[in-house]
Amino acid sequence: MKIDKEISILIDTLKSFFNSENELEENIFDGINWQKMEKVLRYHSIRPILLEQIKKQKIDIPKDFLNRLVKYARYQAVAHLSNELELKEIQKEFALQKITLAPFKRITYQNQLYVDGLREAGDIDLLINRIDLPKAFELFLNRGYIFTNQLHCLNIKQLALDLINAKGNYEIPLNKGLHHIDLHWDISYGFLPYNFPENFILSLENEKDRRNKSHS
């Protein structure tokens, strides 16, 4: 199956990003559909990575397209910083209340696999123990977060209890201004061929503590 040129560029860009020996060809953008290129980059969330590789390898692209990439990269820098600061404040509050909290998915990949905020910022995925939902909801509401319109008018304690006992639903979105949090209390769904122990997040924390002590 023939791959579209725009998709091929995306793949080559990622290869170049993760392995500097795979340099992009100088004429890699010849004959492409720039509108389609922008759509592909937006869908796959690698605009900052493409900009970084273009600058590093001094490849010419249309000025208006370059300007849009630069503008978006600046927005990303602000979004990353804002998310990091918000996450630190949330972690501090949860620690004071003895609630185990684990960031995962996007924000974890961002910190461990990418450099200089090159992964596009988005929501903050957080994982807690199911039993801590009532306290977690209270903390988020006190920080100014709101639920979706359908849930906002419900009794919070009752909502937490319903979710604790629910089957098949393991996350809930919360919003505050530019911040969007997906709060999870499990990471495996009933239709999957595997599951995790009820308190597996505590096991993760214990393992992290063990590793920290072994390196101290």
Summary of predicted features, one role per range:
Residues 1-122, 128-216:
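Conserved NTP-donor binding/palm subdomain of two-metal-ion nucleotidyltransferases/polymerases, i.e.
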